[in-house]
């Protein structure tokens, strides 16, 4: 459910419609990317043999969501991946992990940790005002300002304007500003695995969410 939000639909790069899986050091790492949004999620796993592969995002998502709440076993083969859970078993075709784009590296210039539930409620109030016109990408974003124990979100489609303010504890003397895609902001905060607080950071051309 988490990485599915980053699955691409670019027919010229079919590998982006997949989910990258990597088993290592007692972890299973999942990645998705549409070259605009990249998502990485790690979960604890009993790894008997390390490896990596790419499988169809739509197929693996449909399989996993219909499986019972029990342990799932992944076993790699020659261009295949076997998925087993109790009495259910599937064999999927795979793509080469070597063709998967490396997850973006980033050095955060500024960060801000905020209560996720409060932020989600605020985003819901202004998100509907963001523009749906791709020709004006700046209006598809939500302006976030955190300063003096106040969070402010602003969105507009040039005809309507929505402003939402809330109080929260912030580091004294520090401020944080960013313009974040309204769709991304909304989708990230709607994830079921969202933690009590979310760290938002910026680079010169990226916004990063960590939770």
Which functions belong to the PLM regions below?
Residues 1-211:
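Structural preference for solvent-exposed beta-strand-turn elements
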């Amino acid at each position: 459910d988490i990485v599915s939000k980053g699955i691409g639909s670019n027919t010229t790069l079919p590998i982006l419609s997949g989910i990258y899986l990597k088993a290592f050091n007692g972890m299973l790492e999942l990645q998705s990317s549409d070259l605009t949004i990249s998502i990485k999620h790690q979960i604890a796993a009993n790894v008997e043999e390390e490896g990596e592969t790419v499988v169809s995002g739509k197929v693996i998502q449909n399989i996993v969501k219909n499986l019972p709440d029990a342990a799932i076993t992944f076993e790699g083969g020659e261009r295949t991946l076997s998925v087993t859970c109790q009495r259910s078993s599937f064999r999927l075709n795979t793509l080469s992990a070597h063709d998967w784009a490396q997850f973006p590296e980033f050095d955060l210039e500024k960060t801000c940790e905020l209560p996720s539930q409060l932020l989600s409620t605020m985003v819901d109030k202004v998100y509907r005002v963001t523009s749906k016109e791709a020709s004006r990408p700046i209006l598809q974003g939500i302006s976030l300002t955190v300063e003096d124990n106040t969070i402010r979100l602003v969105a507009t489609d040039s005809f309507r304007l929505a402003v939402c303010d809330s109080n929260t504890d912030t580091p004294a003397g520090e401020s944080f500003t960013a313009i974040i895609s309204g769709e991304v902001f909304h989708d990230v905060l709607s994830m079921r695995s969202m933690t009590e607080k979310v760290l938002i950071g910026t680079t010169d051309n990226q916004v990063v969410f960590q939770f």
